[in-house]
Amino acid sequence: MPVLRSATSTQGRNMAGARALWRATGMKENDFGKPIIAVVNSFTQFVPGHVHLKDMGQLVAREIEKAGGVAKEFNTIAVDDGIAMGHGGMLYSLPSRDLIADSVEYMVNAHCADAMVCISNCDKITPGMLMAAMRLNIPTIFVSGGPMEAGKTKLSDKLIKLDLIDAMIQSADANVSDADVDVIEKSACPTCGACSGMFTANSMNCLTEALGLSLPGNGSMLATHADRKELFLEAGRKIVEICKRHYEQDDYSVLPRSIATFEAFENAMSLDIAMGGSSNTVLHLLAVAQEAGVDFKMADIDRLSRVVPCLSKIAPNTNKYHMEDVHRAGGIMGIVGELDRAGLIHRKVKTILGLTMEEQLNQYDIIRNKDEKLNKFFRAGPAGIRTTEAFSQDCRWDTVDDDRANGCIRDRAHAVTEEGGLAVLFGNIAEDGCIVKTAGVDESIWKFTGKAIVFESQEDAVAGILGGKVKEGHVVVIRYEGPKGGPGMQEMLYPTSYLKSMGLGKKCALLTDGRFSGGTSGLSIGHASPEAASGGAIGLVNNDDIIEIDIPNRAINLVLPDEELAVRRAAMEAKGARAWQPENRRREVSTALKIFGHFATSADKGAVRDKTKL
């Protein structure tokens, strides 16, 4: 029978000092012996996805106490990738994931907490907390802040939906007037919540449902909707129940590593492929799997990408649908339900509800359960009112979207594309693989051959695109931006957005050992592994080299004889200490970033720490 971890500091005469300190936090005599549950919040006023979380921790805490636990809240950092984008701040985004994981581990182990409720939302916070949950392997539930409502405005007397990416693209388009840019800017992000499309934040929150670690609706219920409050309350109640099952009934099946099995990771990746999620999710799932001790690799993602179709096309892959539309169509359980009917889901994996995925789908899939209460839950919709307050409206759609032939979510017979929304490409320029979000690529350029134009930094690439150096037919190569080479593996949202602004969105490709925002679309290929700084062949590309991209055959190659590549590699190695480093790049790199870069592995390993260096 497992003993409460917190007993280390709450039981025995020798812990009188620790108990005295616990009492000073508000604990009473009858609290000692109850499970101490860490409420891991991530409130900050810097990030719209987290600005409304200030009171969420205490909301959960009070429910934990009602259910018989002791709640203690602490906060993690949270970086807004959109605000950090396009300048040196982006170097800190990915490293913050590992810092969050470490900080949660530090706090929970230092204070011997028995369980966690993780309140996350945006890009690196959810994966960082997931990594910590796998390390700690104590009862854990995830509940996120929820998606932002889609922006809406009238331009040229036409009502259009907007999001952050529209503001970025239109602001760089000389054909768009200052007045229209102003309207777009002020309409793109109308409420609190994670940016309204299937960008990285919402993708990761959706994947927690498929992993089995969050409640149904977590990924899709709007941040502003009153119904989301119940997810927080239920998380507080459920974590106490799970604690009792583990610590009192010797039930290890409720622990994160028991739920997030290899099959659960396959379910999560299949969902990601089916919904055309952010390519960053690949990086994060690989990292979380390593922390969980699960042997889930790029080869598994490649295998799944060849059999799972794309069943939903959501912003940034289309302007028609945003997260509010996904929820109306049945949310993540709606997509998983269609994958299940197609025979593409492991049905017997367990979830945090104590159900198998099959049992959970029977309750929460709107196609197989026509219960009015469930119907009402998924009719929760946007209000269209600017606000930073959670649970501030209770608007509902008149009907759910259960049209699986033409709606937001499709069945297998009416798939958006038979090819999935993400693909892994291999070749002599990326021997360990690279990632492309095929859901965001026009099918006319799934096969593309072009001349390389090489940049040693994102900043130089932006200048080259806006300055007219990049022409139709180019493959823009941005290297030394990987986890080690950046260091920090910046997102390349501005280069991809500016290619569209310059009318080159369907006329060029972009290849990088960096990564992309979840808001990226177009022929944008990232995570090239090994990265240039680790001796990857992307570091050997010269201007005007021919690069062939073949998505259907999952191939990407530098059209050069092996002998020429060997000559170039030998010449690079001859540079000694200057080998595999960018030329003429001026970049201030702090000690903290140098430490991250020193230990970072390439993207195919999730950019986690290289433990052989410890």
UniProtKB/Swiss-Prot annotation:
Protein residues bound to Mg(2+): 81, 123-124, 491
Reactions this protein catalyses: (2R)-2,3-dihydroxy-3-methylbutanoate = 3-methyl-2-oxobutanoate + H2O; (2R,3R)-2,3-dihydroxy-3-methylpentanoate = (S)-3-methyl-2-oxopentanoate + H2O
Pathway info: Amino-acid biosynthesis; L-isoleucine biosynthesis; L-isoleucine from 2-oxobutanoate: step 3/4; Amino-acid biosynthesis; L-valine biosynthesis; L-valine from pyruvate: step 3/4
Pfam entry (one): ILVD_EDD_N
Modified residues annotated as N6-carboxylysine in this record: 124
Superkingdom classification of source: Bacteria
Cofactor binding description: Binds 1 [2Fe-2S] cluster per subunit. This cluster acts as a Lewis acid cofactor.
Residues involved in [2Fe-2S] cluster binding: 122, 195
SUPFAM superfamilies linked: IlvD/EDD N-terminal domain-like, LeuD/IlvD-like
GO BP term, example: isoleucine biosynthetic process
Residues at the active site: 517 (proton acceptor)
Coiled coil: none
Any one GO cellular component localisation term in the record: cytosol
Keyword vocabulary terms for this entry: 2Fe-2S, Amino-acid biosynthesis, Branched-chain amino acid biosynthesis, Iron, Iron-sulfur, Lyase, Magnesium, Metal-binding
Cofactor(s) required for function per UniProt: [2Fe-2S] cluster; Mg(2+)
Known EC number: 4.2.1.9
Keyword check for S-adenosyl-L-methionine: no
GO molecular function: 2 iron, 2 sulfur cluster binding; dihydroxy-acid dehydratase activity; magnesium ion binding
Similarity annotation: Belongs to the IlvD/Edd family.
Function: Functions in the biosynthesis of branched-chain amino acids. Catalyzes the dehydration of (2R,3R)-2,3-dihydroxy-3-methylpentanoate (2,3-dihydroxy-3-methylvalerate) into 2-oxo-3-methylpentanoate (2-oxo-3-methylvalerate) and of (2R)-2,3-dihydroxy-3-methylbutanoate (2,3-dihydroxyisovalerate) into 2-oxo-3-methylbutanoate (2-oxoisovalerate), the penultimate precursor to L-isoleucine and L-valine, respectively.
Subunit structure of this chain's protein: Homodimer.
Protein name: Dihydroxy-acid dehydratase
Species this protein is from: Actinobacillus succinogenes (strain ATCC 55618 / DSM 22257 / CCUG 43843 / 130Z)
